[in-house]
């Protein structure tokens, strides 16, 4: 983007909004000064460093950690409202209803521990196999299991 602006005749200076450059400079100075023990300065009482440099580094770490501690959050990904065994059976069919399947993350038995997309994609892929009547790979005879080789 900067190249496009410069080529159009504009003088552009890009700078991060957070963290400010002065905090980054102080962070690097502290890392160079305190080496592998830098993390102790997150809890200044562990270090008992009353020097101006020690106080500045502890303050810098506190300021840099403020944003993730206060502003970062986990997004709420609704899931498991129609979990397998409760609302849907093992073929993702809604129990007690004909011709209805749940094929998204709401069919998960419990919330995934990581990114929800992977679990949702696997439920969707399995639903596709179920709808098309494809068996589980584990139920196929070994000679029918697709094998991909590289040449």
From Swiss-Prot:
InterPro entries, alphabetically? FAD/NAD-bd_sf, GMC_OxRdtase, GMC_OxRtase_C
Any one Gene Ontology cellular component term annotated for this protein? virion component
Q: Where can this protein be found?
A: Virion
* Matches recorded under Gene3D superfamilies: FAD/NAD(P)-binding domain
- MF terms (GO), sorted A to Z: flavin adenine dinucleotide binding; oxidoreductase activity, acting on CH-OH group of donors
- Which key words are in the record? Virion
Where does it mainly reside?
virion
One Pfam family recorded for the sequence: GMC_oxred_C
Q: Which residues form the signal peptide?
A: none
Regarding protein family, the annotation reads:
Belongs to the GMC oxidoreductase family.
Protein name per Swiss-Prot or TrEMBL: Putative truncated GMC-type inactive oxidoreductase L893
* Annotated organism of origin: Acanthamoeba polyphaga mimivirus
Q: What is the lineage of its organism?
A: Viruses, Varidnaviria, Bamfordvirae, Nucleocytoviricota, Megaviricetes
């Amino acid at each position: 983007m900067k190249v496009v602006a410069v080529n159009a005749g504009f003088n552009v200076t890009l700078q991060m909004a957070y963290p400010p450059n002065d905090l980054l400079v102080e962070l690097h100075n502290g890392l160079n000064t305190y080496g592998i023990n830098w993390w102790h300065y997150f809890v200044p009482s562990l270090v008992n460093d009353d020097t101006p440099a020690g106080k500045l580094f502890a303050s810098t770490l506190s300021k840099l950690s403020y944003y993730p501690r206060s502003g970062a959050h986990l997004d709420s990904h609704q899931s498991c409202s129609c979990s397998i065994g409760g609302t849907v059976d093992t073929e993702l069919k809604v129990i007690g209803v004909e011709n209805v399947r749940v094929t998204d993350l709401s069919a998960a038995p419990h919330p995934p521990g990581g990114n929800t997309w992977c679990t949702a994609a696997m439920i969707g892929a399995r639903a596709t196999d179920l709808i098309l009547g494809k068996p589980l790979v584990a139920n196929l005879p070994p000679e029918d299991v697709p094998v991909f080789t590289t040449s």
